[in-house]
Amino acid sequence: MWIKELELKHYRNYDHLLASFSSGLNVFIGNNAQGKTNFLEAIYFLSLTRSHRTRADKELIHFDHSTVSLTGKIQRISGTVDLEINLSDKGRVTKINALKQAKLSDYIGTMMVVLFAPEDLQLVKGAPSLRRKFIDIDLGQIKPVYLSELSHYNHVLKQRNSYLKSAQQIDAAFLAVLDEQLASYGARVMEHRIDFINALEKEANTHHQAISNGLESLSLSYQSSVVFDKKTNIYQQFLHQLEKNHQKDFFRKNTSVGPHRDDLAFYINGMNANFASQGQHRSLILSLKMAEVSLMKALTGDNPILLLDDVMSELDNTRQTKLLETVIKENVQTFITTTSLDHLSQLPEGIRIFHVTKGTVQIDSDIH
């Protein structure tokens, strides 16, 4: 899939913008604080209905307006789709082909994106919540049912934690009802995650071996807070541990086990990647991003859109070449932001170059 056209109204420093793109590489050049990242954020927002930079929607609204409108014309294998998001102080409205979508799970996945931003380099050593978010964003696009089950899980988790914080003593019968619901939704969430990580590992290892010239292997491990011996009995084991932890959870005032506490570990040649070099970290993250692209294509039949936000300068010539070779080979529409073309070691023919200045975007020349 690829974005044919994007229109922004009152989005951050863009008062109004209408732009069309190449189905291949699109490069956005400009000094810092001109709007390059805002532009990629808008594409991300149109796809996932959320920003990767802020939780406060009001920050997305142009300073002298009260509403935001984003519309995009998306070319999918199945045909052209029009996406629209309208944002105001009353909330957000999402539409597909002018039809309002009642649930996020009905909207997300229509346009898939993979974002590679500087903060992704913290994925290995950062907080577990970053790695859970990484899994959730990809799975939500690939399997809309996952978003629904995760939403149900979080709703029951909130109920259980609220009860634990307010209860003066344990009501075992009431907790049993919540435990059953939490284990049911949580087991399905974990099953989806485990399947996803197993599939992602195969793709990521292939890319990592290519980047390292066969010298390194990459493996991934889903680290569950629920102890289980096989995937088929996660529900029973989860339920048992919830019941076993009633007293502990009551005193701590929160739920001590479940997918909300799970993690993801990375290993290079069998060694924990927390102890890898900076160069190995970059190769690992690059391998993951390329694996996300190839796995989405394998599981859905359509390519995602790749957003590279000021990361090319973080990669040496070898890693840049591997990345560009992959997106060209797989026909992935790619958006690259940079302060200078000097940061790009090799640019193939057939790219579209844009200049970004103070919330305006001008095409350099149609196709280079």
From Swiss-Prot:
It is found in: Cytoplasm. InterPro entries: DNA-binding_RecF, DNA-binding_RecF_CS, P-loop_NTPase, RecF/RecN/SMC_N, RecF_2. Its main location: cytoplasm. CDD domains: ABC_RecF. ATP binds at G30, N31, N32, A33, Q34, G35, K36, T37. SUPFAM superfamilies: P-loop containing nucleoside triphosphate hydrolases. It holds the Pfam family SMC_N. It comes from the Bacteria. One of its GO terms (cellular component) is cytoplasm. GO terms for biological process: DNA replication; DNA synthesis involved in DNA repair; double-strand break repair; SOS response. Keywords: ATP-binding, Cytoplasm, DNA damage, DNA repair, DNA replication, DNA-binding, Nucleotide-binding, SOS response. One of its GO terms (molecular function) is single-stranded DNA binding. Belongs to the RecF family. The RecF protein is involved in DNA metabolism; it is required for DNA replication and normal SOS inducibility. RecF binds preferentially to single-stranded, linear DNA. It also seems to bind ATP. NCBIfam families: recf (TIGR00611). This is DNA replication and repair protein RecF. It comes from Streptococcus pyogenes serotype M49 (strain NZ131). The gene is recF.
